[in-house]
Amino acid sequence: VEFPYSDDEKYIELEKRARAELSMPSMRRSRLKKAISMKGLVTAIEAHSGITGLIAEKTVVYSGGGARQFDAMWISSLCDSVMRGKPDIELVDITSRLRTLDDIMDVTTKPVIFDGDTGGLTEHFVYTVRTLERMGVSMVVIEDKTGLKKNSLFGAQAAQTQAEVSDFCEKIRAGKNAQKTADLMICARIESLILEKGMNDALSRARAYTAAGADAVMIHSRKREPDEVFEFAEKF
């Protein structure tokens, strides 16, 4: 709810109370799923610190008599690594990632999508899911890679290994079983197109991952044209 601008003390106090409630984990966690249900298409922008979170929170574009703003924030592992001067190889540990997340959530109210890299070991991912859910995160995205994680933009030029479908499905199932509520969504990011394994492999994995319990899938492409992304969306 956006209250109309007013200098009236009642409105200011009402807005302050509303924003305080929206920042609570139980309120924030469910809002992305509700937004998707209501709008269909939602927009998210990357944030990797308290100040970038505030920029995402407060950016509003007024046009044609209406106002547009971002629906959610994406907490990127790439940007979280780069701002520390570290390579994007899952070097920044989960405790540090969660500290960044907490800094952002402390000063914002928008729903959060957390980039969870590969999710780590299945046994570790279970605890990550529980922590993210408790903090009020709306979605965690994990990619189907194994071994040393490399940035996807390298594609097949860098040695990267895609996880076995059965192993990744087990990780998804373990994460879903660890949840205490239905609010947190697990999104399976598919690297088939990045690793040049073809559309059929991507579609086969997408169906397997959703059958395992994934709430959403993300398809990744390095190409400048969006054709293969659109093709995937149409066929899936």
Annotate each language-model stretch with its function:
Residues 15-236:
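Alpha/beta enzyme core
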